[in-house]
Amino acid sequence: MSRLWITGYRSYEIGTFGDKDPKILVMKYAIKQLVRQQLENGLEWVLTGGQLGVEQWTIEVVLALKKDWPMLKVAMMLPFEDFGSQWQPNSQSKLQVLKQGVDFVDSVSHATYQGPGQLQNYQAFMLNHTDAALLFYDPEFEGKAKYDYKIIQQHQRKTPYPLTLIDMDQLQDYATTYSEQQAENDFFE
């Protein structure tokens, strides 16, 4: 597998506040562990979007991992041309910084937002340009990623397409492991 689509919860859907929120540290830890596993299986490209939450955290994690795995590439694909233009200025600035850091950035639609068809075209693009997906989503805790989950399931009925679904129980396991590692690091410092 060489191209992985990573997406999931938006930051507001899991109640994170500020860049130092412990939930964000756990999410980034989980992303890092999962991307490392995929690197051992031949991962070359991570494709994600620019949404606040899992997608932007993924870009930050992959950019950090590139220090040890320089062959790893990350692409930010956006559904339409003016993506993020309605956000708060600090969120817009963060998006711009991430755009400058990735290996490739483009919009699937080169028009400004016209309607939900652009989002569906974006999903189709991501499915057709990746070999598998990693989705941070739990059907019992709905969020906008439910639309990606549904389209991936539909795609799987037509063609083999591996999906790794990280639910809340698995996130709790990552939180426990992360907490134990932090306590161990604090003990030995």
Curated annotation (Swiss-Prot):
Domain of life: Bacteria
Gene3D superfamilies (alphabetical): 3.40.50.450
Pfam families attached to this UniProt entry: YpsA
PANTHER family for this protein: UPF0398 PROTEIN SPR0331, UPF0398 PROTEIN YPSA
Protein family per UniProt: Belongs to the UPF0398 family.
HAMAP family linked to this entry: UPF0398
NCBIfam families reported for this sequence: PRK13660.1
Name of the featured protein: UPF0398 protein LCK_00599
